[in-house]
Curated annotation (Swiss-Prot):
Designated gene of the protein: MAC2
Induction trigger: Expression is induced when cells are grown in cultures containing vegetable oil as the carbon source.
Summary of the protein's practical applications: MELs not only have high potential as eco-friendly biosurfactants due to their excellent surface activity, but also have attracted considerable recent interest because of thei runique properties, including self-assembly, anti-tumor and cell differentiation induction activities, and moisturizing and hair-repairing properties.
Domain of life from the UniProt record: Eukaryota
Broad EC category: transferase
E.C. code: 2.-.-.-
InterPro entries: CAT-like_dom_sf
Lineage start: Eukaryota, Fungi, Dikarya, Basidiomycota, Ustilaginomycotina
Keywords carried by this UniProt record: Acyltransferase, Transferase
UniProt similarity note: Belongs to the trichothecene O-acetyltransferase family.
Physiological role: Acyl-CoA-dependent acyltransferase; part of the gene cluster that mediates the biosynthesis of mannosylerythritol lipids (MELs), surface-active substances that enhance the availability of water-insoluble substrates.
Gene Ontology molecular-function annotations: acyltransferase activity
Protein name: Acyl-CoA-dependent acyltransferase MAC2
PANTHER family, per the entry: ACYL-COA-DEPENDENT ACYLTRANSFERASE MAC2, CHROMOSOME 7, WHOLE GENOME SHOTGUN SEQUENCE-RELATED
Length: 550
């Protein structure tokens, strides 16, 4: 049996399947456990619908069960809940539901209806400020109906260990189920909720679920590339490059020397604790984003590389050393998605890869960061030059998929270190937040995750999902997804900038904990980035208008 075979799901008892967590998955599971839910996701899909709220609430449990039947991944966990056994953070687990009572219990714990007037944004903020319980649970979903202000929404609250972009597909699947004739017929014909569930319930079987459960990126990589010694060596070379870049002196956003006991900026309190997990947001409209694309094409950059250039330059201007000190470079910490190397079906079909993050790296020398006599004030031409440099460094680092192969060994090392450090600090009685601060550098280097284009379908009817509304009768039920709001947990001393595009508009975010950072400083940096992008878009728009007059 090969190593890759040992990484696959296997039945260990009539009621339990498991597989090892590999690479980034394992690091995320240890990080989530020892760092109070770090990296957990909160993704809200806002919608409008002709379906009454009461009807949606009646259908919601059945819709969720229907989706679990097709996507058993919704029932995975990554921490053993067997109190008599040793702590196991090394495996993904899945147990079949065999009875109606078990199904109802899972639905009660997994699908939550919020109909007390709470808004989607309020719910996103609350979920971002508490970890998912019980520890190891991978998925929970909230249906927000009848908020006092704003639109209703479907909120996926998920662990990042076995999830990522897949959360959008899971939300889309629930939308489809809410409008499906099978679910609407079951609730109409069975007014009693338990009877309605019984009408669609089918006991789960391990042998049917195993081929559908998510595989690791490392397994899919090994299947596709069949790496030998040269490929493995190439992967470790990339890891060495990343470690070397991380050791270089870098600009960054400074954390507090000691975490703030009472952060100056929070979202209020939750259960008596400040909601310090902030997910700041700015948006560039579709027209300006289109202008940005034109400008990037003209100057040989890309929108993500230009955004990154603006982030790097803004951090340098807001947080850089004084002119009398040595100029630092910039360690580029970013994530990439394995879809650049793998076919689309890897992430969509049976046994999907749900956690497909690859850790990218690059380093800007002081001369590249502040070229020539420009200093920190690069101007538009300087920003595009920096964007081209960043894009080349990213392309050079991501010129091979074989870093994926090296992540298995690296994941083992990093997860062991996380556990050892956490145990030492626990024995020393170190405060949990102080421990997270001590484990982090004094400054957070420029960090960006580019999440691409949101591809969730816009309209849902009894006939399915599409990007254009087609009603057989004007009175037919329909639901329209029109906006997305994301949050999540960044519990360590880091600031992660993120970007995504939906219906042409570009959203930029900054995720961090205000116990560790000056929230006003981060807000100023984000606003400055948006301002620089706006200037580039305006310049491109003016150029286009001038050309049109010729």
């Amino acid at each position: 049996m090969t190593t890759e075979d040992n990484q696959r799901w296997s039945q260990v008892s009539p009621d339990l399947a498991k597989r090892p967590l590999v690479g980034v998955e394992k690091v995320l599971n240890y990080t989530e456990y020892y760092q109070n839910g770090n990296f957990q996701l909160t993704i809200a899909l806002l919608f409008e619908t002709s379906v009454a709220s009461e009807t949606l609430c009646e259908r919601f449990p059945l819709a969720l069960w229907s989706v679990r039947s097709k996507l058993p991944e919704l029932g995975t966990s990554t921490v053993s809940n067997d109190q008599s056994a040793e702590l196991d953070l090394d495996h993904a687990l899945w147990q079949p539901i065999r009875s109606l009572e078990q199904a109802q219990q899972w639905l009660d714990d997994t699908g939550v209806i919020v109909n007390d007037g709470t808004s989607v944004q309020q719910m996103v903020d609350r979920l971002s400020n508490r970890r998912i319980e019980p520890i190891g649970k991978q998925f929970r979903v909230y249906l927000v109906c009848d908020p006092l202000y704003g639109a209703p929404g479907l909120i996926v609250n998920a662990s990042h260990v076995l999830n990522g972009h897949r959360a959008l597909f899971q939300g889309e699947s629930i939308f489809k189920a809410l409008l499906s004739p099978r679910i609407s017929d079951a609730t109409r014909q069975n007014p009693d909720a338990k009877a309605a569930l019984a009408a669609i319930f089918k006991p789960e079987e391990l042998n049917e679920a195993l081929p559908k459960l998510p595989q690791s990126l490392n397994t899919a990589y090994a299947d596709k590339f069949q790496p030998g010694a040269p490929e493995i060596e190439a992967g470790f070379h990339k890891v060495g490059e990343k470690l070397s870049n991380g050791a270089q002196p870098s600009i960054g956003i400074p954390r507090f020397q000691i975490p703030s006991a009472k952060p100056a900026f929070s979202l209020g309190s939750l259960d008596g604790t400040p909601m310090s997990m902030l997910n700041l947001r700015s948006r560039i409209n579709a027209a300006d984003n289109q202008s940005l694309k034109r400008a990037c094409k003209k100057y040989g950059a890309s929108v993500p590389s230009l955004v990154y250039a603006c982030i790097v330059n803004s951090i340098d201007r807001h947080c850089g050393s004084s002119s009398s000190e040595a100029v630092l470079g910039a360690n580029l910490a970013y994530s990439a998605h394995a879809s650049r190397w793998m076919p689309a079906e890897t992430f969509e079909e049976r046994s999907p890869v749900n956690m497909a993050i690859v850790l990218g790296s690059g380093y800007l020398s002081p001369e590249e960061l502040q070229p020539g006599q420009r200093g920190r004030n690069l101007g538009e031409a300087g920003l595009f030059a920096l964007a081209r440099t960043i894009r080349k460094k990213q392309d050079d680092f991501l010129d091979t998929p074989h870093i994926i192969g090296a992540m298995s060994d690296l994941g083992e090392q990093v997860s062991s270190q996380l556990a050892e450090v956490a145990e030492r600090q626990r024995e020393a009685g170190t405060d949990a937040r102080v421990a997270l601060s001590e484990n982090s550098p004094l400054v957070c280097p420029p960090t960006l995750t580019s999440q691409g284009v949101i591809t969730v379908k816009r309209f849902y009817t009894a006939q399915g999902a599409s990007d254009e509304l087609h009603l057989e009768q004007p009175a037919d039920e329909h639901l329209e997804f029109f906006d997305i709001c994301t949050g999540g947990r960044t519990t360590d001393a880091s600031v992660c900038f993120a970007m995504f595009t939906h219906v042409g508009a570009l959203t930029l975010q900054a995720h961090f904990d205000s116990h560790f950072f000056d929230a006003q400083l981060v807000r100023n940096i984000l606003d400055d980035v948006v301002s620089q992008l706006g200037s580039a878009a305006a310049s491109a728009s003016l150029t286009s208008q001038d050309q049109a007059k010729l």
